[in-house]
């Protein structure tokens, strides 16, 4: 076993959710409360990559804290009846890792109860730890706090853990904690995102199967 604990991001790493749920939800929110404003799927991916969703809402759409609360409530209602599908192969990775004695954690910008629902609906093993959007803002990634808490609760050393994430906040969090990071490149083909992740991540995987090969094959695969 290369790593005793795998820390998964949720959206666009474990489940295909931005293109199918989160972006359509945001477009509906803009139509309802910011008529005339728009956001393409590529723009949504890029702004979530950097500077992040909250900064995008502040900077691009002028949302104050009250508007952010309204957007969050709109989003929470929208996702409550829509379950994203796990990427093919993710379930097999998690089941094999758990069967070999490994642990699974989730650090995400989705709410913890939605994450657990998605895991159940997709037949994924229940995570040992979940840190989601319900945490205070200063305890959400890219803050190192949730990963520091994983280290504290498990007693593992940084090199026994692998963070798997598709966006920069996860990378920044892992780097701040000295934890190995694997970039999940299977959600989109946006050059700016792929270029950054390939340049700065020692591990970059364009497919779920490539990640599985690295984790479980003796030789590993990049």
Name these PLM-found stretches.
Residues 72, 90-122, 130-133:
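Substrate-recognition element of Asp-dependent hydrolases with the DxDx(T/V) motif
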Residues 2-92, 99-100:
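N-terminal helical cap/lid subdomain that shapes the substrate entry/recognition surface
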Residues 86, 107, 139:
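Residue-level marker of regulatory loop/turn positions in helix-turn-helix DNA-binding domains and
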Residues 1-4, 112, 116-222:
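Asp-based, Mg2+/Mn2+-dependent phosphohydrolase catalytic module
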Residues 31, 92-95, 99, 152, ...:
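Surface-exposed alpha-helical segments enriched in charged/polar residues
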Residues 29, 56-59, 96, 118, ...:
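Residues within well-ordered alpha helices
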Residues 30, 34, 62, 98-101, ...:
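Glycine-centered loop/turn motif at secondary-structure junctions
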